[in-house]
Amino acid sequence: MSRTLHLAEQLISRPSVTPDDAGCQALLIARLAPLGFKCETIVSGPEHFRVTNLWAKFEGFSPSAQAALAQPAIESIANTELSQAKVKTLVFAGHTDVVPTGPLAQWHSHPFTPSHRAGKLYGRGTADMKTSIAAMVVAVEEFLAAHPRPALSMAFLITSDEEGPGIDGTVVVCDRLLARGEVLDYCIVGEPTSVKQLGDMIKNGRRGTLSGKLSVKGVQGHIAYPHLAKNPIHLFAPALAELVATQWDQGNDFFPATSWQVSNIHAGTGASNVIPGDLVVDFNFRFCTESTPESLQQRLLAILSKHQFEYELKWTLGGLPFLTTPGTLVDAVRGAILAETGVQTELSTTGGTSDGRFIAKICPQVIELGPVNATIHQINECVDTASLDPLKNIYKGVLERLAGLA
């Protein structure tokens, strides 16, 4: 059996629904520590929502350290003493947590029992994103077996809180790394980015997300006596029409234009003869680098104020947009994908948010690359079994290119 497949099956068999890691990271530590990774477990969150995070790092070797180690008299010196000269660091990032399974009766096989049918590997987390993690680990194992003293540092940043609130996971680790001056250069997040075939799309950025909860104040009353009431739905309707029609920006070469969408509207008591006293609207901006949270807030507030109704508004900034323009990391990933699959990958910033938004604050080059995403979060989630080792080879190819070995 493929070593990548074997590790993937071990991870899938662990029921790691957010925030429960279910022993996945212990399994990773058991593979990484013998390779020379210094592994650090960071537990965060309240007692009822304990999150497990892993930071594991292998210190690379500068050319001078490699030359020194080639001398017989130097062999006894600890590797850490000879790897102090800084080399670039590549981080593999991901999450061991998965979304809930949904109705078990609708699965063809148990979601936490890896199974194979018609060339596909089934189980919760196969696509999102346990096969990516398995491929990353085996790629590093093979890379270090061939190049035990690479001119590249490597790290893993793994959390069990990506599918949940995301406040005790990757962001906590990034804050700690920033506080102690850890320098990161490149990061690959193992999100399932491929669309029709492995490697046909990678994410070199993501839009920001800004949400709001708007409460419009009216006066409740009898529907037959509207002059004695103030209908908040009617008050808000013209503003809603204007907000929907507003073009917030034009987008740019890397991002589509900023989008404003309403997700929920609630008003009324449920009775058909009562004018509601208030209206609650949940909305969200998915915004590109042409806009800022402040500019979007100011423009929306100006529209609301123009329509002269009483309201309260609470904002939640879920993440800023990030972008990695073509350069060292993008070129390495493109080259590795082309060499393994023959596919010319497409750069994209579409889709939802990911933990890349936190990592981008401390790492200048972040991309996302993983398996086909057609079944993520679905009943009978699966990936092509034959894609696992090619994904591993792509990750290994990136390592070789960043280390100057390809």
From Swiss-Prot:
Enzymatic reactions: N-succinyl-(2S,6S)-2,6-diaminopimelate + H2O = (2S,6S)-2,6-diaminopimelate + succinate
GO biological process terms on file: diaminopimelate biosynthetic process; L-arginine biosynthetic process; lysine biosynthetic process via diaminopimelate
Top-rank EC class of the record's enzyme: hydrolase
Record keywords, A-Z: Amino-acid biosynthesis, Cobalt, Diaminopimelate biosynthesis, Hydrolase, Lysine biosynthesis, Metal-binding, Zinc
Summary of the function given for this chain in its UniProt record: Catalyzes the hydrolysis of N-succinyl-L,L-diaminopimelic acid (SDAP), forming succinate and LL-2,6-diaminopimelate (DAP), an intermediate involved in the bacterial biosynthesis of lysine and meso-diaminopimelic acid, an essential component of bacterial cell walls.
Subunit structure: Homodimer.
Protein name: Succinyl-diaminopimelate desuccinylase
